[in-house]
């Protein structure tokens, strides 16, 4: 499960600056759900290959009401949701009474907590952070969030328990590296690598289906409708996290695991809207799924929350099916307006199937599974190197790559780089310098050629590194002697 990091601290210590720094490392869309989450912000980030969800909370000021009262709002909930807490303090302002109150609360919680002193740029970090050791939270990590200094090292320290131990790679000498480079270049020119053996059988595993959406769009009704049709007893699988309910079921001789993010089995026990709609629960369910079923209320249209969820789904690379619920009872004119609005606002996800359903009455629900099955099959379909290379060559013939610094980009071969989502890796010369428009052209060409529906497709570009880049030629002893004789001859001529 992808870890969750919460940023807490007094106002104006740089929490939002660090949040933006982290979520922009891969231009992740920030999922912002005002009101429902009490103005907390959620984002997906990656630093040095480590992925995580980060929560930005409002500031906590130690007023006369007490820190505990302020904590009972957004920050306390964020701490409870998080696996890791980054307690941020202002190195320039020094230790404040509110910092001590927050630290006292954090020490009482069984959470991995890291003390982060921000705004250390331009000052001596050792001197500025000395007072914070009295908070009793261990080492103080000095950073400058606005400039990014120390942020990468901080995340590596924080994520250390979640990283698999990696064996260090043996370093090659310059001669070995040069020989390996040219050997690889010759191999690339002469032959296309063979496909590796893959024993993975997607049909042997159940499809993990996450049903997500805003509150009151009909997620629970749809879940009960699906389960009611199959007469499967609902129960909670042990070991599930964040209270998402994992429900095994079988449909058309195919096994599924339904991930119900609504978490509502007995309506009488739900007392707060926040309890019904946990953003973290939803985001982690998306990460854990193979296919995401996004439920939209036809009467409310596409809201900013829907687009935020949609952005997170796309960023996660999960397969997608869209269900427009509460379609029954709408007039033909209203239905036409909804369809026009969907075409306008969802044009960027043209690969996703859209179904118009009524979870309450069951109309259209059965057809959802055809698209779910199609999306899963497309995302896990194995495609050989020869076919991918042939498609790449056809795309190149139809539309030549543009010139880069006066030279034509050369596409050598393509192979599969991963699944769910499908990843195509293209090797060649100067491929990393291709324009964004040509990269989109290649992505759409592969999608059409492979008939991929219901899942995003990603294109990665790789080119061999030139071992001589940035190096100066060194003259041999013989060349040095010739150069010396030439220089002496020129001096005599003067």
Curated annotation (Swiss-Prot):
GO biological process: one example: ribosome biogenesis
Pfam family, any one: MMR_HSR1
Residue ranges constituting the KH-like domain according to the UniProt record: 381-465
Binding-site residues for GTP 2, renumbered to this chain: 213-220, 260-264, 325-328
Binding site for GTP 1: 9-16, 56-60, 118-121
Keywords: GTP-binding, Nucleotide-binding, Repeat, Ribosome biogenesis
GO MF, one annotated term: ribosome binding
Subunit structure: Associates with the 50S ribosomal subunit.
Similarity-based family: Belongs to the TRAFAC class TrmE-Era-EngA-EngB-Septin-like GTPase superfamily. EngA (Der) GTPase family.
Protein name in the entry: GTPase Der
Organism (species): Yersinia enterocolitica serotype O:8 / biotype 1B (strain NCTC 13174 / 8081)
Gene that encodes it: der
């Amino acid at each position: 499960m992808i870890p969750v990091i919460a940023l807490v601290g007094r106002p104006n210590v740089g929490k939002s600056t660090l949040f933006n720094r982290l979520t922009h490392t891969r231009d992740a869309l920030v999922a912002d759900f005002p009101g429902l989450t009490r103005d907390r912000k959620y984002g997906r980030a990656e630093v040095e290959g480590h992925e995580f969800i980060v929560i930005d909370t409002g500031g906590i000021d130690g007023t006369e009401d007490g820190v505990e009262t302020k904590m009972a709002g957004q920050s306390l909930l964020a701490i409870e949701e998080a696996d890791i807490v980054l307690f941020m303090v202002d190195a320039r302002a020094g230790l404040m009474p509110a910092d001590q109150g927050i630290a006292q609360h954090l020490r009482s919680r069984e959470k991995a907590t890291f003390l982060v002193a921000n705004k250390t740029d331009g000052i001596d970090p050792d001197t500025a952070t000395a007072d914070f050791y009295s908070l009793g939270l261990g080492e103080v990590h000095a950073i400058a969030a606005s400039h990014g200094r120390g942020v990468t090292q901080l995340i590596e320290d924080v994520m250390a328990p979640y990283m698999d131990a990696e064996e260090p790679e043996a370093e090659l000498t310059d001669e070995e590296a040069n020989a390996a480079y040219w050997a690889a270049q010759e191999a690339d020119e002469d032959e296309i690598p063979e496909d590796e053996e893959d024993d993975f059988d997607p049909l042997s595993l159940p499809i993990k289906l996450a049903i997500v959406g805003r509150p009151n769009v009909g997620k629970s009704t749809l879940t009960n409708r699906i389960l009611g049709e199959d007469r499967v007893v609902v129960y909670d699988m042990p070991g599930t996290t964040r209270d998402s309910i994992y429900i095994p079921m079988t449909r058309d001789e195919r096994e599924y695991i339904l991930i119900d993010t609504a978490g509502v089995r007995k309506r009488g026990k739900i007392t707060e809207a926040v309890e019904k709609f946990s953003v973290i629960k939803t985001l982690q369910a998306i990460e854990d799924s193979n296919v995401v079923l996004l439920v939209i209320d036809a009467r409310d249209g596409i809201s900013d929350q829907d687009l935020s969820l949609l952005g997170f789904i796309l960023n996660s690379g999960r397969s997608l099916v869209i269900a427009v619920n509460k379609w029954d009872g709408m007039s033909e004119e209203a239905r036409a307006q909804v369809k026009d609005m969907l075409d306008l606002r969802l044009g960027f996800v043209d690969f996703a199937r859209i179904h118009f359903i009524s979870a309450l009455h069951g109309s259209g629900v059965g057809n959802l599974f055809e698209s779910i099955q199609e999306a899963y099959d497309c995302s896990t379909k194995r495609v050989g190197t020869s076919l991918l290379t042939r498609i790449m060559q056809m795309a190149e013939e139809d539309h030549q790559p543009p010139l880069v610094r006066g030279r034509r980009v050369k596409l050598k071969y393509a192979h599969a780089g991963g699944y769910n989502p499908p990843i195509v890796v293209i090797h060649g010369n100067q491929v990393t310098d291709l324009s964004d428009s040509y990269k989109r052209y290649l992505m759409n060409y592969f999608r059409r050629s492979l008939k991929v529906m219901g899942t995003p497709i990603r294109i990665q570009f790789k080119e061999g590194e030139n071992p001589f880049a940035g190096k100066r030629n060194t003259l041999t002893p013989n060349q040095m002697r010739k150069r010396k004789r030439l220089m002496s001859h020129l001096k005599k001529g003067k």
